[in-house]
């Protein structure tokens, strides 16, 4: 069981209360617009009534069934949760640096007219995990806090074997291609500070993302950290690449 820091205790009420309080502080109204929800496709995507495909930015939900691929655990429940939140309603779209993804979908944070922050609420409910990518980092910090609360409560996806936190020593070839949350202690660190070991698992920051991490080391030897990323393999073994500062969290010893 992870030890809970004093900061986490102070923020605990946020994890049990619908996240409406973030609406006014994180949005830039001049860059916002309203759309009517037409059809919810899955837990993180919907179609507006004018045919626009909109992807909830900064989060990812389990996959629903697609042709030969079965649904992931909680995939249908995540779709139902988003449907309950936004179906038949007007939602405000707030934007970060990039407004479109490679599939042409609009990337946005969603807010209801009552101020509810939909992306944050999906994370708080345990129906989504944080999935940030540079340069879209404006909402990364509060999303990460909400995910930590959901993990601590083991609610939603965090109650399933597929999404539960792994210890670094337990990451195996069976996890290849999976987005996982992994905890462990930092071991050997590369001289440049952009890669380190957690047991047999290598953690690295690809060159093109390093400028987003600043000049200080991401972690120090002996630190206990939680990392987020896709498990991959190279000639030197299993590794996870970090793409944004929110992909690594320091936790109490």
Give names to the regions the model predicted.
Residues 2-253:
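Small beta-barrel nucleic-acid-binding modules, primarily SNase/OB-fold domains
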């Amino acid at each position: 069981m992870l030890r809970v820091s004093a900061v986490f205790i102070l923020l605990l009420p946020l994890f049990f209360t619908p996240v409406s309080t973030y609406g006014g502080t994180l949005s830039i109204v001049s860059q916002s617009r309203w759309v009517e929800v037409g059809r919810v496709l899955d837990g993180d995507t919907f179609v507006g009534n004018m045919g626009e495909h909109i992807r909830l930015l900064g989060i990812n939900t389990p996959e629903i069934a697609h042709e030969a691929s079965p649904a992931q655990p909680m995939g249908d429940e995540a779709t139902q949760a988003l449907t309950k939140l936004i179906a038949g309603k007007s939602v405000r779209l707030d934007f970060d640096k990039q407004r479109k993804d490679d599939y042409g979908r609009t990337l946005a944070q969603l807010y209801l007219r009552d101020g509810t922050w939909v992306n944050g609420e999906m994370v708080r409910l345990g129906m989504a995990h944080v999935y940030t990518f540079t340069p879209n980092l404006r909402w990364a910090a509060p999303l990460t806090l909400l995910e930590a609360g959901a993990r601590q409560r083991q609610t939603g996806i965090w109650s399933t074997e597929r999404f539960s936190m792994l210890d670094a020593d337990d990451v195996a070839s069976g996890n290849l291609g999976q987005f996982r949350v992994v905890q462990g202690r930092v071991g050997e660190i590369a001289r440049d500070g952009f890669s380190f070991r957690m047991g047999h698992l290598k953690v690295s920051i690809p060159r093109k993302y390093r400028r987003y991490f600043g000049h200080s080391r991401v972690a120090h030897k002996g630190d206990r950290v939680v990392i987020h990323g896709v498990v991959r393999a190279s000639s030197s073994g299993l590794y996870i690449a970090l793409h944004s500062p929110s992909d690594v969290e320091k936790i109490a010893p």
